[in-house]
């Protein structure tokens, strides 16, 4: 099935590309998510007329994501306290939701889906590097310091 992409899609293409995908992928994912429209003559003409508007909108979203990534990088570190044993091993773990809440409390709005933990959840006290994927092309890093509670 031929579709026109309205957004950048990983491993498929970027805005304006006409790609051939399986019908189920288009019907169940791309079209409902607003990432593509079927490539009919009417849709091709409509897209070409609105191409500049869509590209400007995509550029605005990218600029906003880069601004948020800069704010995250400027934070340098965020401290989270959690109950821990004698050797610094946490009772439980610190996951994406806890990190997103701590960063949001520090002043930068972050969703838990944007937090990337390359080594899994944090289970020990100390300093950990956490990655954020704010946009498909924009990444940020932040040090999270886990301190044991008394």
UniProtKB/Swiss-Prot annotation:
HAMAP family to which the protein is assigned, alphabetical: Ribosomal_bL9
Functional summary from the UniProt entry: Binds to the 23S rRNA.
Source organism: Yersinia pestis (strain Pestoides F)
Similarity section: Belongs to the bacterial ribosomal protein bL9 family.
Keywords: Ribonucleoprotein, Ribosomal protein, RNA-binding, rRNA-binding
Coiled coil regions in record: none
One Gene Ontology term, aspect cellular component: ribonucleoprotein complex
GO biological process: translation
Gene that encodes the chain: rplI
Entry's Gene Ontology molecular function annotations: rRNA binding; structural constituent of ribosome
Protein name per Swiss-Prot or TrEMBL: Large ribosomal subunit protein bL9
One Pfam family cited in the UniProt record for this chain: Ribosomal_L9_C
């Amino acid at each position: 099935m031929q579709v026109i992409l309205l957004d950048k899609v990983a491993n498929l293409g970027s805005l304006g590309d006409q790609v051939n995908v399986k019908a189920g992928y288009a019907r169940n994912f791309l079209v409902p998510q607003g990432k593509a429209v079927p490539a009919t003559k009417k849709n091709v003409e409509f897209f070409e007329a609105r191409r500049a508007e869509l590209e400007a909108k995509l550029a605005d979203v990218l600029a906003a994501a880069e601004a948020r990534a800069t704010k995250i990088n400027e934070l340098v570190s965020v401290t989270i306290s959690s109950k821990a044993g004698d050797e610094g091993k946490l009772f439980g773990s610190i996951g994406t939701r806890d990190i997103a809440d701590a960063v949001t409390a520090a002043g930068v709005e972050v969703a838990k889906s944007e937090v990337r933990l390359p080594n899994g959840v944090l289970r020990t006290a100390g300093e950990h590097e956490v990655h954020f994927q704010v946009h498909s092309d924009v990444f940020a890093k932040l040090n999270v310091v886990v301190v044991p509670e008394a």
